[in-house]
Swiss-Prot record:
Xref: Pfam families: Anticodon_1, tRNA-synt_1_2, tRNA-synt_1g
Binding site for ATP: K725
GO biological process terms on file: leucyl-tRNA aminoacylation
UniProt catalytic activity: tRNA(Leu) + L-leucine + ATP = L-leucyl-tRNA(Leu) + AMP + diphosphate
Name assigned to this protein: Leucine--tRNA ligase
């Protein structure tokens, strides 16, 4: 081990401060010295089975642990104290398991493509890479100060060419694959072509494959691919000059960045066929150790429902409707199409019927004018806004359809509450038993028919169960029997079939931006796309004169995208030989969405230096492969622990699961899921202040006088919210590190409450964590002389032995369960015992130093060295409890919230106030009842109860 620079005492303190006290200045010196040692010695570097990171003899420990954080976007503002919460928690977890002997992989990269850097480039002319790399340098500096035990050799940015080469490679694997529904998995597209050529698979129209032209064959193959082009309804933002994903559009139909209007329009875009995996994405949720809330969110997003597909006949052809309630078909009194439905133009009549109701016309003189006017009126509405509870609007098409149940003619409308992206984009409206249909019917004077008994449909739609009425041969049946009977009749009549439908839509996978991964796709002179061969990767981003797409009047809904890459004309036009001789091709000028890199980055951590493959199969299998002996027979494999915010519960996690499953099907990975275990950390919250206009003011400049708050002489008003830039209440971790030291920041954040719960930040309370570390320091170091004050041969009394081993057992369990707040409480309690009893025995103090190490690693390393050890404690040993000292009486405490018992906890009979408080706050029932709220006060009555005042 290299020699660690000796940390110097704080000589800047006042004359009354002991020379060798653990102060912020001394903490800074210790932390800098140990961070340098860790870097020089590669303390946290972990070996791979094969490749550049493999040891000379190729042996790696069988007992591994892969810990991963959701990597950050490197913004220009840097970190605030809310950002490190999850990073510190995973570091504590990784350090604990590393000390128990596991081979722990823990690294952190950067999710660096995206709109913010591009917008900065547009404003300043600075290349996005320049800004991004500067931000990453600052992030690494700030994260480095926290003492995170990362294997820095494995760090990367999604903007690194060596990284996005493999993002493009994965795109090609997905593009060159199709989903075999019989086998329920993806297969290489070459196997599909082979089946057509051999006759194993035939065309729907019966033509022999050999009779098709090259173009016709390509069209057939393209229709099967997992990546395809389609004319899709997209969120077009003229003010930004780009298409936006749904998550980038606010609830009121404006862009999340810039607040520009967003319009729904049809454009040809790249799509990924994630819907092919709907059932597997649902089914495999059962084998994941994820929060129930996240699983529920994914289930709802996928939205599997069973029902029937029903054909309503019209003069323009059949309208297909999907319904989960075919039993109510006799109550369908009108149809509603999404305004974007492809049959709208054919169905819209030239003139209104003579007896048309004026409410149906949308104020237009003809149905076709009504369609145009209605579409224009909703163009700027988001899908969410279209489904809000409000006065129903719509327009009659001047056309009718035939209800296949009773032969009645029902009018056809368009309305915004029907979305083209769900089902077939058409609904049969049953106003007697669907509230939205009931409201529409009452707005437009349409008939309401009761077909399920048991409710009063004059007041509202009845959505409950009952027996069928007014339904011919279904009368008297219950709902389940009626569903089966009507479906059988529809099948027999050729007017329908049983069907499963999903809310999940295929993934829009293109953006009209500059700062993203280029597509490895070129187009021939006929506009047909061709994938580049793997040998042509990477397709690097070219320089362009400026980085902005062509911007339009924000209200110009008819404008068309013109991506920035079109400006790189020398790059766009390229001569290639793709098997038919040298030809001129045109590159695709869209870029991939920001989700692309995060959809597979866990794999690159396992083999970041590999230039020949995404990752070696041996390395992926070691770090992520299934381990049924440890996790059970259904173990899907994946990262052992993934920690991040619940805001990524659906999209990022769903996309990464999809990509991983395709790679699994194609034989590139052994794990069928990317993340075996997921934990969502809470938010750090803080007070924010608004002036009389409701604008936020800098919280750091607000002063309190006589119970009121003032900013620049004017009264402001206090509120509580998520800490961050928008609320102007950010606190930099640099500030806390400067004033107290990084270990104090780590201990404070981990002590604030359960990891999953949100917690209030209070800088004034940080000193409590610092004082705890000072007490630990004083157990080893004499503050006056700096000498080690530990006695080597002092025997431990029974009380101390019991306190020690109970602490070891409890802290071990807490670290393993990510209960860092209760671990800290136990360590504080044990430290107080040693201090109060004047214990100086090495046998009592060395285990404390080892147990403190995951929380406060710099301090622990320094004390370990001063205790005479010449190796780092980063690899242990972590203390092991002696069972003979764990036998103890326990006490059950009722836990009250505002005076009412909500749960009960069992603790050691001699548990102190801090342990009781931490255990109460960590209780699952209490957490569920608090629902993220922070108690104003915690009352502990020893031997009786704990009461949380909210």
């Amino acid at each position: 081990m290299t020699e660690t620079p000796t940390a110097q005492p704080d000589r800047a303190a006042d004359a009354d401060t002991p020379q060798h006290r653990y102060t912020a200045e001394l903490a800074g010196q210790i932390e800098g010295a140990w961070q340098q040692t860790w870097a020089v010695e590669g303390t946290f570097n972990v070996p791979n089975p094969v490749g550049e990171l493999a040891p000379p003899d190729g042996t790696v420990p069988a007992d591994k642990m892969f810990v991963q954080d959701m990597f950050p976007y490197p913004s220009g503002e840097g970190l605030h104290v809310g950002h490190p919460l999850g990073y510190i928690a995973t570091d504590v977890y990784a350090r604990y398991y590393r000390m128990t002997g596991r081979n722990v992989l823990h690294a952190l990269g950067f999710d660096a493509f995206g709109l913010p850097a591009e917008q900065y480039a547009v404003q300043t002319g600075t290349h996005p890479r320049t800004r991004t790399e500067a931000n990453i340098v600052n992030f690494r500096r700030q994260l480095g100060r926290l003492g995170l035990g990362h294997d820095t050799r494995r760090s990367f940015s999604t903007t690194d060419v060596d990284f996005y080469t493999w993002t493009q490679w994965i795109f090609l694997q997905i593009y060159n694959a199709w989903f075999d529904r019989d086998a329920n998995r993806a297969r290489p597209i070459a196997e599909l072509i082979g089946e057509f050529e051999s006759g194993v698979r035939t065309l729907d129209d019966g033509r022999p494959w050999s009779e098709l032209s090259a173009g016709e064959r390509a069209d057939v193959v393209d229709s099967y691919r997992l990546v395809y082009r389609a004319d899709s309804m997209v969120n077009w933002c003229p003010g930004l000059g780009t298409v936006l994903a749904n998550e980038e559009v606010t609830a009121d139909g404006r862009s999340d960045r810039g607040n520009f209007p967003v319009f729904r329009k049809r454009l040809r875009q790249w799509m990924m066929r994630i819907t092919a995996y709907s059932d597997r994405l649902l089914e495999d949720l059962e084998v994941l150790d994820w929060p129930d809330k996240v699983k529920t969110m994914q289930r709802n997003w996928i939205g599997r429902s069973t029902g029937a597909s029903v054909q309503f006949g019209t003069d323009a052809g059949d309208i297909e409707v999907f319904t989960t309630r075919p039993d109510t078909l006799f109550g369908a009194t009108y149809l509603v199409l999404a305004p974007e439905h492809p049959l709208v133009e054919q169905l819209a009549a030239e003139q209104w019927p003579d007896d048309v109701d004026g409410r149906w016309t949308f104020g237009a003189t003809t149905p076709r004018e009504a369609v145009a006017a209605y579409r224009a009126s909703i163009a700027a509405k988001s899908d969410l806004e279209r489904q809000e509870n409000k006065t129903k609007t719509g327009a009659f098409l001047g056309a009718y359809a035939t209800n296949p149940a009773n032969g009645q003619q029902v009018p056809i409308f368009i309305a915004d509450y029907v979305l083209i992206g769900y089902g077939t984009g058409a609904i049969m409206a049953v106003p007697g038993h669907d509230q939205r249909d009931w409201e529409f019917a009452h707005e437009f004077g349409l008939p309401v028919v009761e077909v399920i008994s048991g409710g009063d449909i004059s007041e509202a739609a009845y959505a409950g169960d009952g027996l069928l009425v007014n339904s011919d041969y279904l009368d008297g049946l219950d709902v389940a029997a009626a569903k089966a009977a009507i479906t059988d009749r529809l099948v027999a009549d050729g007017r329908g079939r049983a069907r499963v439908e999903y809310k999940l839509r295929d993934w829009l996978f293109a953006r009209q931006r500059y700062w993203g991964e280029p597509f490895p796709i070129v187009y021939d002179s006929d506009g047909r796309p061709h994938p580049l061969p793997e040998s042509a990767l990477p397709v690097e981003l070219p320089d362009v004169p400026d980085y902005s797409p062509v911007l339009f009047d924000p209200d110009d809904a008819d404008s068309e995208p013109n991506p920035p890459l079109n400006k790189a004309t020398d790059w766009v036009h390229v001569e290639l030989d793709l098997g038919d001789g040298l030809q001129t091709y045109t590159r695709d000028t869209n870029v991939m969405p920001q989700w692309a890199g995060s959809s597979w980055y866990e794999l690159r951590y396992t083999d970041p230096l590999n230039k020949e493959a995404l990752c070696a199969k041996e390395n992926e299998a070691y770090w992520m492969g299934p381990r049924p002996a440890e996790h059970g027979p259904d173990d899907p494999g994946g990262v052992d622990l993934y920690v991040g915010g619940v805001e990524h519960a659906v999209l990022h996690l769903l996309y990464s699961r999809f990509w991983h499953k395709v790679l699994y099907d194609l034989g590139h990975v052994s794990s069928r899921e990317p993340y075996r275990r997921l934990v969502n950390q809470g938010y750090i919250q803080a007070f924010a202040y608004t002036d009389s206009r409701g604008s936020y003011v800098p919280a750091a400049e607000v002063v309190e006088r006589d119970g009121k708050f003032w900013f620049e002489g004017a009264e402001v008003f206090q509120e509580f919210g998520k800490i961050g830039k928008s609320l102007k209440n950010s606190v930099s971790p640099d500030e806390i590190c400067d004033n107290y030291g990084a270990d104090t920041l780590r201990v404070y954040e981990m002590s604030m409450g359960p990891l999953e719960a949100s917690r209030p930040w209070a800088t004034k309370d940080v000193v409590g964590a610092h004082r705890f570390l000072q007490r630990v320091w004083r157990l080893v170091v004499d503050e006056q002389s700096g000498a080690v004050r530990v006695a080597n041969h002092e025997a431990l009394d029974t009380d101390t032995l019991r306190a020690l081993h109970r602490t070891v057992a409890g802290v071990s369990e807490d670290y393993a369960a990510l209960r860092n707040n209760t671990a800290a409480a136990k360590l504080i309690e044990y430290t107080n015992h040693l201090t109060k009893e004047g214990v100086t025995a090495r046998a009592a103090i060395e285990p404390l130093v080892l147990m403190v190490a995951p929380l406060a690693p710099h301090l622990a390393e320094e004390l370990w060295r001063r205790l005479g050890h010449d190796t780092s404690l980063a690899h242990g040993p972590f203390p092991v409890a002696d069972p003979q000292y764990l036998v103890t009486d326990t006490v059950e405490y009722p836990v009250q919230v505002n005076g009412k018992v909500r749960s009960r906890i069992t603790v050691d009979a001699d548990a102190g106030k801090d342990t009781l408080e931490a255990a109460a706050l960590a209780d699952e029932k209490v957490q569920a009842f608090l629902n993220g709220a922070t108690p104003k006060k915690v009352i502990v009555v020893p031997g009786r109860l704990v009461n949380l005042v909210v």
